Amino acid sequence: MILCLRLCLRASRSFFSISTTNNNNNLSRFLFRFSTLPHCAASSSSSSSNLESYYANLILSSHGDSNKPNRKWSSHQFRLLLTDPNLLIRVLNMIRVKPEIAFRFFNWIQRQSDVKQSRQAFAAMLEILAENDLMSEAYLVAERSIDLGMHEIDDLLIDGSFDKLIALKLLDLLLWVYTKKSMAEKFLLSFEKMIRKGFLPSVRNCNIVLKVLRDSRMMNKASAVYETMIEHGIMPTVITFNTMLDSCFKAGDLERVDKIWLEMKRRNIEFSEVTYNILINGFSKNGKMEEARRFHGDMRRSGFAVTPYSFNPLIEGYCKQGLFDDAWGVTDEMLNAGIYPTTSTYNIYICALCDFGRIDDARELLSSMAAPDVVSYNTLMHGYIKMGKFVEASLLFDDLRAGDIHPSIVTYNTLIDGLCESGNLEGAQRLKEEMTTQLIFPDVITYTTLVKGFVKNGNLSMATEVYDEMLRKGIKPDGYAYTTRAVGELRLGDSDKAFRLHEEMVATDHHAPDLTIYNVRIDGLCKVGNLVKAIEFQRKIFRVGLVPDHVTYTTVIRGYLENGQFKMARNLYDEMLRKRLYPSVITYFVLIYGHAKAGRLEQAFQYSTEMKKRGVRPNVMTHNALLYGMCKAGNIDEAYRYLCKMEEEGIPPNKYSYTMLISKNCDFEKWEEVVKLYKEMLDKEIEPDGYTHRALFKHLEKDHESREVEFLERLLLS
C-alpha cells in the first residue's frame, strides 16, 4: 500500500510540473462544481487526489502521437474511470490543458461497453472543447449525448455555473445537432428554455429550424419561432425572411406573405435573387399571376440576371389555369431576352397539356423536343394512363427504351400505377419483377402502389402480403404506406385497426404524421361515412401544429355533400375563404358535382360562376359535372349546347362527356343520336370504355352486349 502511494505521489509530481497556475484555478473550479464526494478526512482527500493525478499522468504519458486512441489502453487499466463518472470528470479537468488528448480519451471511453454514462461528464467534455474552439470535436460529443437520449444536458448548461459565453456556444451547438437530425420538437424545447433564461440563440440556428419546420409543414410553430425572434431582438436576415415567405406560400397564407415582404422593406433588407424567385414561384403556384408578374418585373429592374428558373414558374402558373397563349407569351419573352427554354420548360407544357386533356398536343410537343429526358416521357405516360390509354403509355415506354434514355424508378412506378388502376394487378406484379432485371429495385412507392391496387380491388389479404414483403426487403414504410393500409382497414369497416396503424406509425417514426397523412386519413373516414371522426381529425391538425390546406377542407366538404348536408358544406367553404385558403379547381368540382348530383343545378351553376370570378379556370371535370346535372334533369338540348360551349372554350369533351350524352339518348330511345355520338368519339380517337358500352347497351340483355359492340363498330368502320 505504501509502495502504491509513493508511485501515485511520484506520478502526481510529474503531472503537476506541466501545469500552470491558471490551469490549477480551473481545476479547482471544476472539481468543486462536479464533485459529489463527501468531504472526508484529509488523508482520504489526499488519496483521492493522488488517484486522479495517477490517471491523468497515465493518459498524458500513453496517448501516443496519433490522433486516434492508444491501442494499448484497456478497460481493465481504466476500470475506475469507466464506473465512476465523478472521478472521470475530475481526471478530464486535470488534463484540460491538452484538450485534443482529453477528447481522444473521452472518445475511447465511449466505445467501452461497460462505461457508466453521465450528463455531467458530457458537459465537462463539451466545455473543455468549447473553451479551446474545438467545435468539430464538440459537435461529435454533443451528437453522442443526444443519441444516448441526454436531452436534459441543456439544463446543465443553462442552470450550471458555466461561463455564459461558453454555455451559449454549446447551446447553439446542441440546437445545430437537433436541426441536423430533424428533431424539431427537441429543438423547440431547448429554444424555449434558452429564451426563458436569457440565452439568445444565433440567428443562424433560428434560420435552420425555420427551414426544418417549413419542410415539416409545421407552419404555426414556424410563425411562433419567428415572432419570438422579433420579440427578443434576434435580428432576422434575408434568409429568415425568405424561409418565412416560402412557409407562408406553402400554407396558402398570402395575407401573411404581403406582411413579410413589406416588413423586409421597412427594415431596409434588400431582396436577394432567392427572395424574388420565391415570390414569383409562390404567387404563380397560387394563381396570382398579376403579383408574380410584378415581382418578375421588379427583379429585372433591380439588375438581377433572369434565368429559366425565373420564367418557368410564370409559364407553369399560366398553364395550370389553361392560359396557354399567356404561357407562350412568356416563352417569347424568354427568347427575346436571349434565354432558351430548357427541357424543364417543355416538361411544364407537356404536364399542363395532359392535365387539360390535350394529350395529342403533348405528344407532338415531345416529338419536337431536341433532347427530351426521362421526365418528359414519364409525364406523358402518366397523362396517357390518366386518360385510360394504357396501350399508348406502353408504346411510349417502348420508345423510351429504344432510345438512349434509361427508364427510372418513376417510369416503372407510373406504369405499375396504370396497371393497378385498370385492375390488371397480375401485370403490375410482373412489371415489379421485371424492374429488378434492369437493376431498378422497387421502392416504398412501388409497394404502396400495389397495396393501394389490391385494397381498391377489395383483396386485403394480397395487400397485406405485399406490405409484408416490403418489410422483409428492409424497406421502411412511410406515412403514405401506413395510410394506404389504414384506408384498407377503414373500407372493411375496421376503424380500430386503422387507428392502431396510425399509432404504430407515430411510434415507429418517432414523429407526428404530416399534413398529407392527416388528409388521407380524413378522406378514408369520409368515404366510410364517419364524418364526426373526420371533423375531429381536421381539428386535431391545428393541435399538432399543422395548418389545414385546401385539400383538407375539400375532403370534408365532399363528405358533407355526399351525406346531403349542403349547409354544413357551405359553412366549411366560407370558413376556407375567411382563412384565406383559396379553393382549387378540385374544390369547385366537388361543390358543383355534389349539387348537380342532388338535382340542385342552380346552385351548381352558381359555384361555377363564383369559380370563374375568383380566377380559377374550369377544366373538363367541372364541365362534366354540370353536363351530368343537365342530363340527370333531362335537359338534353341544353346539354348539347353546353358540349359546344366546352369546345369553344378550348376544353375538348372526353369519354365521360360523350358517355353521359349517349346514356341519356338511350333513355329517350334516340338511337340515331346514340350512333352519331359513338361515331364522333371514334373519329376523335376517344377510346370508349366499359362504362360507355354499358351506357350504350344498358337496355339489352348482358349476353348480347359484346356482340352488339362488335356489330356497331364494324358498321361504323364500313
UniProtKB/Swiss-Prot annotation:
<dbReference type="InterPro" id="IPR050872">
    <property type="entry name" value="PPR_P_subfamily"/>
</dbReference>
<feature type="repeat" description="PPR 10">
    <location>
        <begin position="478"/>
        <end position="512"/>
    </location>
</feature>
<keyword id="KW-0677">Repeat</keyword>
<keyword id="KW-0496">Mitochondrion</keyword>
<dbReference type="GO" id="GO:0005739">
    <property type="term" value="C:mitochondrion"/>
</dbReference>
<feature type="repeat" description="PPR 1">
    <location>
        <begin position="167"/>
        <end position="201"/>
    </location>
</feature>
<feature type="repeat" description="PPR 15">
    <location>
        <begin position="654"/>
        <end position="688"/>
    </location>
</feature>
<feature type="repeat" description="PPR 5">
    <location>
        <begin position="307"/>
        <end position="341"/>
    </location>
</feature>
<comment type="similarity">
    <text>Belongs to the PPR family. P subfamily.</text>
</comment>
<feature type="repeat" description="PPR 12">
    <location>
        <begin position="549"/>
        <end position="583"/>
    </location>
</feature>
<dbReference type="InterPro" id="IPR011990">
    <property type="entry name" value="TPR-like_helical_dom_sf"/>
</dbReference>
<feature type="repeat" description="PPR 14">
    <location>
        <begin position="619"/>
        <end position="653"/>
    </location>
</feature>
<feature type="repeat" description="PPR 2">
    <location>
        <begin position="202"/>
        <end position="236"/>
    </location>
</feature>
<feature type="repeat" description="PPR 8">
    <location>
        <begin position="408"/>
        <end position="442"/>
    </location>
</feature>
<dbReference type="InterPro" id="IPR002885">
    <property type="entry name" value="Pentatricopeptide_rpt"/>
</dbReference>
<keyword id="KW-0809">Transit peptide</keyword>
<feature type="repeat" description="PPR 3">
    <location>
        <begin position="237"/>
        <end position="271"/>
    </location>
</feature>
<feature type="repeat" description="PPR 11">
    <location>
        <begin position="514"/>
        <end position="548"/>
    </location>
</feature>
<feature type="repeat" description="PPR 7">
    <location>
        <begin position="373"/>
        <end position="407"/>
    </location>
</feature>
<dbReference type="Pfam" id="PF01535">
    <property type="entry name" value="PPR"/>
</dbReference>
<feature type="repeat" description="PPR 4">
    <location>
        <begin position="272"/>
        <end position="306"/>
    </location>
</feature>
<feature type="repeat" description="PPR 9">
    <location>
        <begin position="443"/>
        <end position="477"/>
    </location>
</feature>
<feature type="repeat" description="PPR 6">
    <location>
        <begin position="342"/>
        <end position="372"/>
    </location>
</feature>
<dbReference type="Pfam" id="PF13041">
    <property type="entry name" value="PPR_2"/>
</dbReference>
<feature type="repeat" description="PPR 13">
    <location>
        <begin position="584"/>
        <end position="618"/>
    </location>
</feature>
<protein>
    <recommendedName>
        <fullName>Pentatricopeptide repeat-containing protein At1g22960, mitochondrial</fullName>
    </recommendedName>
</protein>
<feature type="transit peptide" description="Mitochondrion">
    <location>
        <begin position="1"/>
        <end position="11"/>
    </location>
</feature>
